[in-house]
Amino acid sequence: MNSENIIKVIKGKKVVINGEIKPASILIKNGIIIDIKDYSSEIKEEHEVLIEEEKLVIMGGLVDSHVHINEPGRTEWEGFLSATSAAASGGVTTIIDMPLNSSPVTTTFENLQTKIESMPGKLRVDVGLLGGIIPGNSSEISRMVLEGGVVGFKSFLVHSGIDEFPHVKEDDIQEAMNVMKKLKDEQGGRDVVMMFHAEIEEPIKEATERLQRENADPKLYDTFLKSRPRVSENIAIDKVIELTKKNMIKTHIVHLSSSDAIEAIHEAVHNDGVPITAETTYHYLYFESEQVPYGNTLYKCCPPVRESENKDLLWKAVTNGTINIIVSDHSPCTLDLKLIEQGDFMKAWGGISSLQLGLPIIWTEASKRGVPLAKLSEYMSDAPSRLVGLNDRKGSIKIGRDADFVIWDPEESFTVDQGLLMVKNKNSPYHGEKLLGVVHHTILRGNKIFSKGDQTISKIIGKRLIQTKIHTNPIYPSPTLPTIELLNSLTEQKTFFDCIHLLFEAAPPLANALFSKRPFSSYQQLIDQAYSIIQSLNESDKIQVINAHPRIGVSASQVKNSSSISYREQSCDKDSSIDQSILENLTQLNQQYESKFGFKFVVFVNGRPKNEIIPILQNRLNNNDKQKELNLGLSEMIEISKSRLLKLL
């Protein structure tokens, strides 16, 4: 049997689905979950049983939306291969890479391309990329999204730790938000998140100068803690809330440390409808400042690990939903930068390495607090994937999503040892900690990429991820159709529409009718059915269907509400080299055509030069039969869908 036609099965007595733990059989085809059946359902002889487990818990693969991979340029700190290997061994199937501390930093389209070029052959798990917002780079934002495929942006309100990634001020943020608002409008309301390291400099500077005057001991953790007061976070978060409320674009507070800011975030979201979210990290939910040993700079990070009372309040915010994301903020460095011998918290590099250990770290603490195990899937899979617009493919176990799983034992414990860690720099404050929860298997798109006891992780099948719902420039990976079986099984109209949007531009009269005509035996039958539906529509609906297509010869920005396939078919990537007189001629002819017939001109272009379209359009203008012209345009639309189908299957 062709490997693409093989259906794999994962069976478990303890499967986390829709916030519950229950028995289930999960069917997988081409790396996608195509069905979820009862555990007792019969397995067909031709099916391949990948996992059958009675004791272990099966959850959707973890999504860590805050990881510093540091490649290219600082691969002695970390790199794609070591970071994704560590992720795989920890049940993490998707990671989102921060725009620093790589060199160059990812603040321009050119630098982004440099990062992308460093990725092939090194990804054990799937990876999405963030861009950076710094003073003066707002002109790069749209291109990094629409051509580069970043899934969000990160900026600092305080010095980032490296000079090439300067922090932003209010005017810089507003300038960037103006671009983000325009981008959101062009994408039909879909937005890309702006993430903020929320500390401001003034309280930190004042506290540090006071501590210096007092000759405070830099080896005492309390000295460092006092140098990063909560008020620095609180003021910064208030400012982000203010700007988010003003501009109403999606924002996110990374690594929230100060429990003082929780109430402001809660009120902004629940009282004012501000589209802001917040995350906290493994180390803030596990460590306490009181336990940090004298001079042990492995515990240093910014913002700092705070008091036990603060930790309890962070957990309360997690369980009540104010903080809905838990991430690693994996930020490694070489041991020399930690100044271990000097033990100087004030001068050592700030950052904690924990990518591989997230599930047991959080379960160790969550289990003590009575947090249901199934909630971990929301905190560590669903919410992070939603943050970066990948929840159509990533997150908890759901039909239509990638077949990504972590299979683990929540009752088994282990002691952290450097020999277990797969990151490049293995020094960690978790060394020697006894944690609850052991990962036994990690599955990526239906492929086993890690098993306990096998430290090789031989498969390199990770991919770079982009947001499929933001249709853009053709340097993106080609879009793909789900199997016809999966399409038939979709129960949500919106998901169905998103799929057939690759064949037909979004037009409700056609999409609604097709949804009601399921199941289809093949995509060819679906297209044939679409043609029959179109022929039966009234004139108004026919015009709505044909007007869903972009105009021939429009600029790249005007195609962005249409599908990415439409973008390629019209050769928009070559627009910059086209004679402007040709585009002007096409614009005039389009206007004449629409004025005469009352709908858009549609022709099967498929990459032909635009100058070859002009005589076709001129000839069609000579047609005086509106109905004949309308039917001709719709027939061309069907030919377009047939051509697309050949490319997509």
UniProtKB/Swiss-Prot annotation:
GO terms for molecular function: allantoinase activity; cobalt ion binding; zinc ion binding. PROSITE patterns: DIHYDROOROTASE_1 (PS00482). It is an enzyme of class 3 (hydrolase). Carboxylation allows a single lysine to coordinate two zinc ions. Its EC number is 3.5.2.5. NCBIfam families: allantoinase. This is Probable allantoinase 1. It comes from Dictyostelium discoideum (Social amoeba). The gene is allB1.
